[in-house]
């Protein structure tokens, strides 16, 4: 949150006379009570003569393309002559008699903009009438000239101090659980704790903010408001101001606080609502009362209902969105943004101020659903104090009458009660037990009361009732946190615990790490697949309706509307990564990912037990049963070349064989042996897909992806992939170390003629088994077909490497092992040895 230093120090200075600290100390104060600052910066400096002026005459110059005004401005004796200053200006939002801010020749404005006397538009211009953006108070959107009440200063007096140009803006990082701190009220409360100051709550005593509330005693209701239970809304209030001057502008002091907090001044009524929000943390909305017809109903929208918000976007609503409606239709998207139909305009004379307390989750979902984050929604989704609806309405009404005239109606609509805060029981010694620091009972009680809690003491037990603005305090651990942070986290000693003996990675963790290392060593780059996916990808793949991968688990509050289920396969995310990389000009790469997937399992409905104590075993069992099945999968994908052309020879494309080899690398790292079999499984090519088996049970697939699926998805042709259920592999606790031999190896080849239908992998496995203990490796290096071999016949040539661990092998021993392998192949497949 952006907030000016002078605002918070001014609020604190009301009860702590003379208190003032440097910006660096204020920054440290925020940090001391647990609030980081993203940074702080002074308002850019203006040097040279910057004075108040009074516009005496305005000459309209109409002979130019845009309207130009030649002004004579009274700047007193600041120009050295006492004569009126001649200034040419293009702004239109000031008139004769207005008090303005003038930079005279010799002044240098922010951005090194030097002011000098020069002729422009045929007139001499000796100075500039300044806007807020030119003085560094706002961005270029706030380009209007600053017009002031004459009480700010006489013509010729220095304007810096009166305008508050010697100030510093802080950007305070407010965490989601501390919504109360998105206001001057919340931040000054924290700073009072940081500097041991007296805090006066502006919601109780508005005088600390310079506001004297003047509203008539409440007599009756304004209009009827129906707050339907389905909306989960807590409170709703209305107050009316009638007969305001629609041309009135908010005063500079208010505009200044708004601009330094990142808000854009709009009109008097809107500026008042934004100021009250920044002061108290209560978002408000101003309706043009003339455009509101009949009673108001706060209800859930009908699916498909249309509504145009203040940002001129026509939105299609969801049945979970909460709306405020009158007889004419929807007037506001509750807690997020108002509508155009009842917007404050330059003809508005009667205003309804609305302040409410909305359900945090409902507002958060609506904001995310419509991609519409506003200052109001940021506060409502973090929690707003339900007890300040009345004072917010009264302050807003008071300020608007002061600014724009009119009267506050005696009627007030208020629906809903302030919810009772639930007391929390805590041992007074609990903070000391958790922090390892001795906190006295007096310290614990004082810190909790400083937060705003009511504390009842019974022996060594405290019954703590949180204040209405601290909805985040729900259990004793929250109270402990408050004591620790206010006493100073730096007071807690850093003690490294002694590691228990015999602990380390589990066997499953070791396997996961080994698999990751093996694939990285094989040249694959690791990515982190998304745990969410779009289920429509399975329609593109053409999966059957009963395919296991369609048993997805829906996400109630998805980050993206399209990716609304938990992934049952890593391939959709892996292929998205391929598509992104190819779009960026990377065409040759191979990736791998290790991630859990989730399959629907059990009841699917999780109970919501209290976190105050350990739930019963039956509840734990119900929780476990409701969880989805979450096996660990590993996947690889490759496209383009795996070897590049160069002086060493031609390059080689990544093929389905490489995808299968990646599965073998996983198996070796896991200490198991995979069996291969031909398979027809989507999204793979039916003729270039291998099933990965353990004891005859499929645990995954590898191969080239189906060309039609690749085309539909916009992926490169011949992209290959592998996915394997790592959790389905038997866990080998202690992988056997490889046997190393210092004796030389013998190499022999064998070629076997078999039927075309027999897989080469099956023949390879039989050759390895038949060769006995002396065989070290069996590798297929050639497949040959010809008329001489016969129809539906093929020749498979294998390279055999033999080695003994205790001696040098003879050719006779290797030949005998080779012949034994051929005999077993003949027995199993009727294979004939060639050559």
Swiss-Prot record:
Give the matching InterPro entries.
Answer: aa-tRNA-synth_II/BPL/LPL, B3/B4_tRNA-bd, DNA-bd_dom_put_sf, Fdx_antiC-bd, Fdx_antiC-bd_sf, NA-bd_OB-fold, Phe-tRNA-ligase_IIc_bsu, Phe-tRNA-ligase_IIc_bsu_bact
GO CC annotation: phenylalanine-tRNA ligase complex
Q: What is its main location?
A: cytoplasm
Q: Does the keyword Ligase apply?
A: yes
Q: Which domain of life is it from?
A: Bacteria
Write down the EC number.
6.1.1.20
- Reaction catalysis annotation: tRNA(Phe) + L-phenylalanine + ATP = L-phenylalanyl-tRNA(Phe) + AMP + diphosphate + H(+)
Report the cofactor remark.
Binds 2 magnesium ions per tetramer.
Its required cofactor(s), as named, are: Mg(2+)
Q: What positions does the domain B5 occupy?
A: 419-494
Example GO biological process term?
Answer: phenylalanyl-tRNA aminoacylation
One Pfam family hit: B3_4
Every tRNA-binding domain range: 44-160
Subcellular localization is given as: Cytoplasm
Top-level EC class, please? ligase
GO molecular function list: ATP binding; magnesium ion binding; phenylalanine-tRNA ligase activity; tRNA binding
Domain FDX-ACB per the UniProt entry, residue ranges: 741-834
* SUPFAM superfamilies tied to this protein: Anticodon-binding domain of PheRS, Class II aaRS and biotin synthetases, Nucleic acid-binding proteins, PheT/TilS domain, Putative DNA-binding domain
Q: How does it assemble?
A: Tetramer of two alpha and two beta subunits.
Question: Which PANTHER family does the annotation name?
Answer: PHENYLALANINE--TRNA LIGASE BETA SUBUNIT, PHENYLALANYL-TRNA SYNTHETASE BETA CHAIN AND LEUCINE-RICH REPEAT-CONTAINING PROTEIN 47
HAMAP family membership: Phe_tRNA_synth_beta1
**NCBIfam families on file:** pheT_bact (TIGR00472)
Tell me which family the UniProt entry assigns to this protein.
Belongs to the phenylalanyl-tRNA synthetase beta subunit family. Type 1 subfamily.
Q: What is this protein called?
A: Phenylalanine--tRNA ligase beta subunit
């Amino acid at each position: 949150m952006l907030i000016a230093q002078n605002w918070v120090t001014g609020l604190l200075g009301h009860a702590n006379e003379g208190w003032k600290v440097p910006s660096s100390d204020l920054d440290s104060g925020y940090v001391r009570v647990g609030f980081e600052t993203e940074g702080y910066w002074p308002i850019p400096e203006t040097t040279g003569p910057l004075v108040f002026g009074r516009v005496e005459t305005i000459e309209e110059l109409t002979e130019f393309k845009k309207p130009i005004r030649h002004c004579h401005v009274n700047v007193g004796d600041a120009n050295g002559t006492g004569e009126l200053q001649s200034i040419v200006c293009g702004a239109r939002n000031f008139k004769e008699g207005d008090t303005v801010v003038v930079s005279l020749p010799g002044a240098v404005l922010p951005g090194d903009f030097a002011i000098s006397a020069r002729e422009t538009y045929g007139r001499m211009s000796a100075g500039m009438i300044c806007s807020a953006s030119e003085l560094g108070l706002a961005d270029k959107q706030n380009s209007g000239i600053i017009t002031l009440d004459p009480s700010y200063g006489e013509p010729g007096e220095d304007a810096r101090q009166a305008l508050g140009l010697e100030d510093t803006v802080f950007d305070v990082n407010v965490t989601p659980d501390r919504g109360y701190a998105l206001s001057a009220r919340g931040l000054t409360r924290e700073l009072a704790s940081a500097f041991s100051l007296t805090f006066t709550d502006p919601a109780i005593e508005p005088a600390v903010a310079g506001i004297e509330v003047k509203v008539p005693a409440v007599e009756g209701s304004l209009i009827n408001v129906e707050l339907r239970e389905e909306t989960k809304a807590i409170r709703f209030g209305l107050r009316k101001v009638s007969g305001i001057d629609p041309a009135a502008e908010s005063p500079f002091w208010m505009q200044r606080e708004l601009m330094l907090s990142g808000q854009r001044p709009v009109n008097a009524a809107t500026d008042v609502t934004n100021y009250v929000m920044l002061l108290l943390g209560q978002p408000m909305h101003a309706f043009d009362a003339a455009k509101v017809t009949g009673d108001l109903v706060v209800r859930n929208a009908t699916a498909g209902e249309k509504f145009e918000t203040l940002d001129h976007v026509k939105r299609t609503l969801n049945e979970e969105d909460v709306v405020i409606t009158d007889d004419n239709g929807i007037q506001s998207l509750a807690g997020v943004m108002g509508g155009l139909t009842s917007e404050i305009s330059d003809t508005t004379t009667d205003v309804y101020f609305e302040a409410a307390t909305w359900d945090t989750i409902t507002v958060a979902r609506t904001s995310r659903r419509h991609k519409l984050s506003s200052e109001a929604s940021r506060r409502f989704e973090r929690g707003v104090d339900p007890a300040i609806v009345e004072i917010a309405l009264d302050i807003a009404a008071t300020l608007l009458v002061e600014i724009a005239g009119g009267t506050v109606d005696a009627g007030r609509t208020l629906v809903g009660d302030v919810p009772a805060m639930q007391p929390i029981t805590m041992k007074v010694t609990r903070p000391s037990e958790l922090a390892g620091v001795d906190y006295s009972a007096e310290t614990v009680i004082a810190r909790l009361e400083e937060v705003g809690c009511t504390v009842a003491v019974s022996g060594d037990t405290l019954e703590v009732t949180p204040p209405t603005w601290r909805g985040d305090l729900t259990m004793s651990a929250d109270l402990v946190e408050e004591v620790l942070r206010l006493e100073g986290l730096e007071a807690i000693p850093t003690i490294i615990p002694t590691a228990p003996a015999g602990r380390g990675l589990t066997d499953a963790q070791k396997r996961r790490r080994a698999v990751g290392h093996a694939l990285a060593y094989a040249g694959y780059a690791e990515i982190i697949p998304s745990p969410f996916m779009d289920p429509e990808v399975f329609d593109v793949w053409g999966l059957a309706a009963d395919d296991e991968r369609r048993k997805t688990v829906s996400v109630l509050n998805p980050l993206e509307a399209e990716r609304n289920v938990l992934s049952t396969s890593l391939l959709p995310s892996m292929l998205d990564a391929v598509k992104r990389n190819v779009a960026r000009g990377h065409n040759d790469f191979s990736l791998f990912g290790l991630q859990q997937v989730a399959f629907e399992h059990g009841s699917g409905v999780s109970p919501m037990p209290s976190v105050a104590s350990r739930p019963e075993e039956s509840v734990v069992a119900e929780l476990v049963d409701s969880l989805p099945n979450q096996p660990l999968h590993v996947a690889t994908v490759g496209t383009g070349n795996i070897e590049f052309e160069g002086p060493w020879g031609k390059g080689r494309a990544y093929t389905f064989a490489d995808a299968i080899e990646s599965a073998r690398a996983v198996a070796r790292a896991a200490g198991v042996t995979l069996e291969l079999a031909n398979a027809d499984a989507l999204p793979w090519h039916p003729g270039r897909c291998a099933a990965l088996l353990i004891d005859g049970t499929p645990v995954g697939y590898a191969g080239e992806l189906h060309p039609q699926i690749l085309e539909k998805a916009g992926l490169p042709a011949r992209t290959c992939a592998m996915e394997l259920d790592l959790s389905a592999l038997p866990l080998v606790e202690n992988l056997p170390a490889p046997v190393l031999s210092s004796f030389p190896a013998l190499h022999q080849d064998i070629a076997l003629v078999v039927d075309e239908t027999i897989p080469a992998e099956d023949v390879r496995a039989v050759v390895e088994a038949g060769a006995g203990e002396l065989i070290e490796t069996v590798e297929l290096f050639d497949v040959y077909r010809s008329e001489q071999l016969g129809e539906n016949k093929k020749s498979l040539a294998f390279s055999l490497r033999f080695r003994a661990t205790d001696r040098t092998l003879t050719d006779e021993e290797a030949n005998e092992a080779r012949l034994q392998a051929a005999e077993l192949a003949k027995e199993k497949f009727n294979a004939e040895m060639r050559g």
